């Protein structure tokens, strides 16, 4: 892990060198996910973070954090009309996130959007199952235990899935599992309080930031899991079992400095 931490310490201080992150996330039912992901990316060192959200939640997301840039697409759900906006964002970004809180998205539109993205990406939550029909050779997938079923059903194991698709997978749990190129790594940092809502979004933001700063996908997944766990340990030491995701996010700089 020291090798990966040294990679972080070598990041240039020049503006934009620390990466621009695009986020396609959120819905009327889950308007807070874009801000959680974005704040985690910013605290991990990204220079600029831009969220692309459905029109009905634009005002909510835009008012949550003045550090977050926010664009919108028409309609209440992610549909065909949002694919072109996603492609445009990917041309601006150094890394992209798709999926957190993306309720009722059109699966075909999600798959098509992923296929238009040329930069490294993190595929999460409600974009995971539609992504299985897309090109994932530039992706890190971050399923929870409940979301990994379709992958195992289709491929038998995470190792087989990673070998066949080229994807990297981070499966969080009591012991996190990172699978890349058919190999499995483990991360044991973290506490039992890390099951609180929003820590998955925090992980996504951290990993996306590392990708945007130039790390390869395997390194970003491995270090991202470690950073989340260590940051959670610091936050839990302060707040006890009442720790929430924003407590964790605010301790990210203490972990990576």
Swiss-Prot record:
Residues that bind AMP: 200
Zinc-finger in keyword set: no
Gene Ontology molecular function, alphabetical: ADP-dependent NAD(P)H-hydrate dehydratase activity; ATP binding
Database matches in CDD domains: YXKO-related (cd01171)
Coiled coil spans: none
PANTHER family listed in its UniProt record: ATP-DEPENDENT (S)-NAD(P)H-HYDRATE DEHYDRATASE, ATP-DEPENDENT (S)-NAD(P)H-HYDRATE DEHYDRATASE FAMILY MEMBER
The protein, known as: ADP-dependent (S)-NAD(P)H-hydrate dehydratase
The encoding gene: nnrD
